[in-house]
Structures are given as structure tokens and as C-alpha cells.
Amino acid sequence: MSETIEDRLLNKQVCMRCNARNPTDAESCRKCGYKNLRTKASERRSA
């Protein structure tokens, strides 16, 4: 259980349809069932 704060906040997957946060090992969204998940961005995008 040596999980850093950064790992806990950033190691997630985000649904492309409803933007729900999902665990990293998820195959589909927990809210809407959509299969297209992306990993949460770990760096801010520049303008």
C-alpha cells in the first residue's frame, strides 16, 4: 500500500462519452457502459 498521492489522483481512466472517472483496469465505463476510455492526463496542456 505504498501508493503516492500523485498515483492515487492521476492513475485513472476517463470515459470519452460521460467523463466519469474509472479505475485503471476498467474495460468499460461504470456509469454508462461505454468502452472507449482514455487515461487521465498527467500534465496540464499548454494554451
From Swiss-Prot:
Source domain of life: Archaea
Keywords attached to this entry: Ribonucleoprotein, Ribosomal protein
Disulphide-bridged cysteine pairs: none
Entry's Gene Ontology molecular function annotations: structural constituent of ribosome
One Pfam family cited in the UniProt record for this chain: Ribosomal_L40e
GO cellular component, one term: ribosome
Example of a GO biological process term: translation
InterPro entries on file: Ribosomal_eL40_arc, Ribosomal_eL40_dom, Ribosomal_eL40_sf, Ribosomal_zn-bd
Transmembrane feature ranges: none
HAMAP family reported for this sequence: Ribosomal_eL40
Family designation: Belongs to the eukaryotic ribosomal protein eL40 family.
Protein's name in the database: Large ribosomal subunit protein eL40
Organism: Halobacterium salinarum (strain ATCC 700922 / JCM 11081 / NRC-1) (Halobacterium halobium)
Gene for this chain: rpl40e
